[in-house]
Regions:
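Active-site neighborhood of glycoside hydrolase catalytic domains
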Residues: 1-54, 58-72
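Structural recognition of the beta-strand scaffold that forms the well-ordered cores
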Residues: 33-36, 54-57, 75-78, 124-128, ...
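Short flexible/disordered coil segments
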Residues: 35, 39-60, 92-116, 186-204
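Tryptophan-centered motif/residue detector
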Residues: 36, 56-58, 84, 130-135, ...
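A glycine-rich phosphate-binding loop feature that marks nucleotide/adenosyl-phosphate handling sites
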Residues: 38-45, 82-85, 171-173
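Histidine/acidic-residue-rich catalytic or RNA/ligand-binding cores of hydrolases
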Residues: 46-47, 86-94, 136-140
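Aromatic-lined glycan-binding groove of carbohydrate-active enzymes
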Residues: 63-129
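C-terminal functional modules
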Residues: 117-205
Length: 205
């Protein structure tokens, strides 16, 4: 729930009511609700439940992380300026800057706000892929190529935070030796040894 206009107060209040309603609706199935941060942008009077609610903190102008923590929300750090992939769009990232993320970023960095490491209300981080431009030639394989190095890098950062002891250059070389999983080869790797990958036979009648 985000990116609604806040120009009209009645719309803001309905948006907040909508958000609160569906938080409770999801919880009615025994699940934890997760919302996209918008309650700074949609500031109003209608209360929105915060206890045991996860909020994806993606843009501080929409949800000020300090204020959201004060209100009681648990945050997932997904700042758009670092962790948004929009394939072949010309804005955000086509591929994440994994070196910068590995060396400098942790979930405690939400936009320009930096919180203490292992803050009890910051539950982790994630990246996002948004396929804004359908039909631009990007296939599911292309998305895989963009996602896999991001996944490897963020897996390390979720585990170690700021305490990455292995130099990035060593990590980056080592990650290339890891397979996607037993028997999985979505990337279509063929190895370093030259070999035929396609043979065409001509049959004579």
């Amino acid at each position: 729930t985000d990116e609604y206009s806040n120009k009209k107060k009645d719309v803001v209040e309905k948006f907040r009511e909508f958000t609160d309603h569906y938080i409770r609706f999801v919880e009615g199935f025994g699940k934890q609700a997760c919302v996209w941060g918008a309650l700074t942008h949609a500031k109003g009077d209608t209360p929105v439940k915060s206890e045991n609610v996860l909020m994806s903190a993606w843009y501080n102008g929409y949800a000020d992380p300090k204020e959201m923590i004060k209100q009681g929300y648990d945050l997932v750090s997904v700042p758009d300026g670092y962790l948004y992939i929009v394939p072949a769009a010309g804005y955000y990232y086509d591929y994440l800057n994994t070196e910068m993320l590995y060396k400098k970023w942790t979930p405690a960095h939400i936009g320009k706000e930096v919180f203490p490491e292992k803050h009890k209300q910051i539950k982790g981080g994630m990246f996002a892929v948004w396929n804004d431009h359908a039909g631009n030639g990007i296939s599911t394989k292309d998305i895989h190529y963009r996602v896999f190095p991001a996944l490897q890098t963020l897996a390390v950062k979720m585990w170690t935070g700021k305490d990455c002891k292995v130099p990035y250059e060593t990590f980056n070389a080592a990650r290339l030796s890891l397979s996607e999983g037993p028997g999985v080869n979505v990337a279509g790797r063929i190895g370093k040894t030259p070999r035929a990958v396609y043979n065409q036979e001509t049959l004579k009648p």
